[in-house]
């Protein structure tokens, strides 16, 4: 999803705008 691995599929929306 995002380049940050800490960002899960669920957190992808808030991690990557």
From Swiss-Prot:
Cellular component, GO, one term: extracellular region
Source species, domain of life: Eukaryota
GO molecular function, one term: toxin activity
Residue pairs linked by disulfide bridges in the UniProt entry: 1-16, 2-12, 7-15
Residue positions, PTM 4-hydroxyproline: 17
Subcellular location(s) per record: Secreted
Keyword annotations of the record: Disulfide bond, Hydroxylation, Secreted, Toxin
Expression sites (tissue/organ): Expressed by the venom duct.
Protein family membership: Belongs to the conotoxin M superfamily.
Note on domains (UniProt): The cysteine framework is III (CC-C-C-CC).
Protein name as annotated: Conotoxin reg3i
């Amino acid at each position: 999803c995002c380049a940050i691995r800490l960002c899960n599929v669920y957190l992808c929306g808030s991690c990557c705008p």
